[in-house]
Amino acid sequence: MIIVLKQHAPADKVQAFCKELNSMGYQINDSVGSDTHILGLIGDTKALAESWVLANPVVETCRRVSEPYKKANRKFHPDDTVVDVGGHKIGGGYFAVMSGPCSVESKEQITYVAQRVQAAGASILRGGAFKPRTSPYSFQGLRAEGLELLQEARKVTGQPIVTELMNNEHIPLFLDAKVDMIQIGARNMQNFELLKAVGKLNVPVLLKRGLSSTLEELVMSAEYIMAEGNPNVVLCERGIRTFETSMRNTLDISAVPMLKKMTHLPVVIDPSHAAGIAFMVPALAQAAVAVGADGLMIETHNDPAKAKSDGAQSLTPDQFDDLMKTIKPELEFFGKTLN
């Protein structure tokens, strides 16, 4: 149930009302917007009479919510959430570009790429230290050493880093490395124990949509994180599996406006994994801006032909420069601030 409070309702009476609701067993998601103050009740409200709620002098109106997600629901939180990643904002009109190699391969590689993408306008450095691969014989990443190299690149550029967490056992390593944003990959989108674990951390989370997951399933995974106390979740559309075989995945561009309607969380697009082919990345990136995304995640490699993973979808630094020159005017046209 959503309860909309009257403007300028006395704080002591609102507090007393909330205390009474708590005593009845309901959790309260308190959302204060620019024009509205909303209490989102979490729990079974079937027995809670609307007439009883409306009788309270601080209540303007109330309505029941049928969706299973509450904390992520835009009805509970009408204003856009803005997630801060190392001083760079995502959402609410702020647009962030995350770029870097699929895999961290060496100090020279990650530092060079970090400097190039930062110069072009990327505010957040992406790079894989632990790599989930389809084949057990493929390069699995430098692991702990990769985290160390990401830290060294951060010292050089000052960029916050985002990298993928694959299991709960690695959390201490990520905390020691002071990872600025934890990525939950598509294959782990419904690893509920992992979601609950990152929900207990004070670190922003980039949650990627699973290859065959519905939008509601994606939002419910975000709900797992938020239910544990971490509100800083960014959703990522990275392509879904369809019958089409000419590209790696199919970018569900319609996911962005629908997710914006369903939830208040920022939504970014990963055109690299969506296409799997480098020449398509700039066009999909432009489409992402036009459809209202809050950011991009793009793979850039100093020498894609020699990349240890996902070279076919990686841009060169020069190609990334050109992409950024293309989307900057587009961002300005749509009133987004590159942050």
Regions found by a protein language model. Name each.
Residues 95-101, 125-127, 161-163, 180-184, ...:
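Hydrophobic faces of well-ordered beta-strands that scaffold small-molecule active sites
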Residues 139-163, 197-204, 253-267, 313-336:
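Alpha-helix-loop-beta-strand connector modules within alpha/beta enzyme cores
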Residues 129-133, 187-254:
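Conserved anion-binding
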Residues 121, 173-182, 197-205, 226-232, ...:
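Glycine-enriched alpha-helix->loop->beta-strand junction motifs that scaffold or abut catalytic
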